[in-house]
A protein has these predicted regions:
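Mid-domain alpha/beta scaffold segments of enzyme catalytic cores
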Residues: 1-178
């Protein structure tokens, strides 16, 4: 069975050129997510998409602390991709103060994604039910939930909507993850 990496931050690596080449050499299908439109733009400027590497336009909810969501920049980049990620909600203690800002940005992104039929890579820490609600309200049909850590009831509702989940080894090493 061929695995697909649906959540890889190429820009996190100092030796990103090496990883770009290695992914292509291994023929490993990979979705390279980004944390902001600026990072997405930089990745697209440095690297071309290949059969094995696609870039996703993102706005990580954790960015809301440092960098306001720029709708115009997001709208300018959206025609260049069918993939959106990393986007979502993070209501953990460190980011809960920006929950309203996160919701506003995520609603905007979900509305665009539904219209464009884009595939989303979604962050949902401590906000799983709200994330599900926003995806459904916007009519998003194509989403991959990244590193899910919520309850089983919400998990089943996400599955009922036809959403997918990205699973990694670290997730499976905890009791809750298993």
């Amino acid at each position: 069975m061929q695995l697909i990496d649906t959540h890889f931050h190429l820009d996190y690596y100092k030796n990103h050129r090496y990883w770009y080449e290695k992914i292509n050499e291994l023929k490993q299908y990979t979705l390279c997510v980004t944390n902001s439109p600026g990072i997405y733009h930089s990745c697209k400027r440095l690297y071309k998409e290949t059969k094995y590497i696609k870039f996703a336009l993102g706005y990580n909810p954790q960015q809301s602390v440092e960098e306001p969501f720029q709708r115009e920049l997001f709208l300018r980049e959206i025609p260049k991709t069918s993939y959106i990620g990393e986007v979502g909600l993070d209501f953990s203690r460190k980011y809960i103060a920006t929950s309203r800002t996160q919701i506003d940005a995520f609603e905007f992104i979900c509305d665009i994604a539904a219209k464009e039929n884009s595939l989303l890579s979604v962050h949902s820490r401590n906000a799983e039910a709200e994330t599900l609600n926003r995806l459904k309200m916007s009519g998003v049909t194509r989403a991959i939930i990244h590193w899910y850590s919520g309850d089983v009831v919400t998990l089943n509702k996400l599955l009922d909507e036809g959403y997918y989940f990205s699973i990694n080894a670290n997730m499976c090493s905890t009791v809750k993850g298993r």
